Amino acid sequence: MSGAPTYDVIIIGAGIVGASAALAAVRMGAKVALVDARLAGRASDAGAGIVSPVALDRGEARPAWTSVITRCVDHYRKLLPIVDALDPAGAGSATFRQVGELVVARSDREEQATIAAIRDRLSTETGRQAHGVSVSPTDVDASEIRKYWPELREDLVGLFIADVGRVVGSRLTDRLITSAARWGQDHGQGSGLTVVPGLARLGSDRVTTDVWVGHDRLSAGTVLVATGAWPAPGSEMFGLGISVRPVRGQIVHLRLPNGATGDRPVVNTTGAGYLLGFDDRVVVGATHEDVGFDARVTAGGQHAVLAAALELAPGLAGAGFVETRVGLRPVSSDGLPLVGVVAPGISLVTGLGAWGLTLGPLLGQLAVEEALGHRLPDWLNFLSPTRTPAVAHETSATIHTGAA
């Protein structure tokens, strides 16, 4: 089996993490192979696309976790100009737009207590800096909320947080890969991207870093596994103490008769789902189902999402149905991502859960930089794949809120 193509790094998985890693690697001068099987249920393609530095759940008060979210959101400001320069045809607000976020609550005491806690966290300059928020959130009453979203129920109160955006995950992923290919074409000198379709498996001897795609062998100095909820075949040899499972999210896309929803802020709640406006649709979600690798749209899932959406926004009853997307989120057994080296020459990024589109671009870049000889920042040490499992930070629920 001589003559196998040789690369500086092989990246397995072309979702948001792998695509971001590919762009970062070619910009470092690396020769990159990006392998992907295009399996149904890839979370990057289905995710609603909330990019927010302020979490509503999952241990949001932990300084280390808050720091990761803040840095990853800030990374968008650096990444998007690079992508726009390399892929000018796709530049503009269709990929990413800062629209702000309405965190809303009914009269329920627990819901309003959550909003009060967010307000308190962001009331000081220190708190805002910790979360990467530029201005204090603004209290909004029912009439102000309905100026943004007339379809919402009339008894809501909440906060408006300006530093929140929304992203079309599938579009950004495609543009990252296009940008990586363009960089290689423009700069040459040994760098470049080769996209290899197919299901990859790692070599079984733990000595080489060969990757097999069908009957073809690829060789590299290092491998980055970014396969989301799917374990890369051969990765069982890592023997990690933390497992990753798929959690299905069904997300419904609707269209209002009057359209023009692209500038509306994200609407988020503490337990009744979320709404996002895009140029041609409204996205509502999402389920949170432990059903293995079943990527089907189900009647029960659509019913759960639509029932919650209509209870929150009765005015959506007249909206037209566009589609339902399904993503299998990779959720770790302790609810936190896994980022770093797992064996000589092999690195891993997975377990991003509902935070994939927020965390993926920066974590993918940092992981491939480490794979190519750089040091992973100390602030990511607590996410080491070889860590002792912590207490879980995410639990199942029918409707999931947050940064899905």
Report the location of each language-model feature.
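C-terminal catalytic lobe of FAD-dependent flavoproteins
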Residues: 315-404
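Extreme N-terminal leader/targeting segments of oxidoreductases
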Residues: 1-8, 27, 396, 401
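N-terminal Rossmann-like FAD-binding beta1-loop-alpha1 element of flavoenzymes
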Residues: 7-33
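Helix-loop-beta segment of a Rossmann-like dinucleotide-binding subdomain
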Residues: 90-106, 128-182, 287-291, 350-351
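Short hydrophobic core segments
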Residues: 10-12, 218-230, 364
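Dinucleotide-binding Rossmann-like beta1-alpha1 core, especially the glycine-rich loop
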Residues: 50-144, 148, 310
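Active-site substrate-recognition segment that forms the wall
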Residues: 20-28, 37, 49-50, 92-97, ...
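A conserved short coil-to-beta-strand element within the FAD-binding core of flavoproteins
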Residues: 188-210
